Amino acid sequence: VNELFRWYETTALPIYNPGEAARGVKGKIPSNVADSPLCHLSVSKWCFENKIEATSKERSERCGRLTADVCKKAVEILNRKIEEGNAFKCAYPMQKSVSYCGECHLTKGNEANWGKGIMDCTPCHSGGPAVSDKFKDHP
C-alpha cells in the first residue's frame, strides 16, 4: 500500500485514455499531481487547477480513468513483490515530513505518539491557503 500511495501522490494522473470506448468524455483530459492519496484532496486539487466543476462529466471521467490507472499500478506492484520476494524495495522513499513528524508522532513510548499512518503530512498541515499551519511554532 505504501508504494501505491507514494506513486499516486507523485504521478500526474489520469494516464489512461480509453479513446472511443469512453462512456463519458472522449479524448484526452487534463492530469495533475495530487500530492495526496485522499480522494477529496486529489479531486478538489484537480478541479481547481483545471477550472473544472466538481459536478462535471469531466470530473466523473477523471475518476473512472484514475481508477484504471491505480488498478494497473497495484497489479504491477503485486507482481514485483511476488517476483522479488524479500528483496523487494520500495521505489519511493518515505517523505521528509513523515520522517520528521514521525520522530514524535509515530514513535512508541513518546508522549505525542498518537499519529497513525504514513501519508505525507504537508498536504493537510503545511499552512497553505486552505489548511492550518501545524509546522508553525512547532518543534
Predicted regions and their residues:
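The canonical Cys-X-X-Cys-His
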Residues: 100-108, 118-127
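Amphipathic alpha-helical interface segments
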Residues: 3-78, 85-92, 99-100
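Long, repeat-rich segments with strong aromatic
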Residues: 108-114, 132
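Solvent-exposed alpha-helices and their adjacent loops that cap or buttress functional pockets
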Residues: 93-95, 113-115
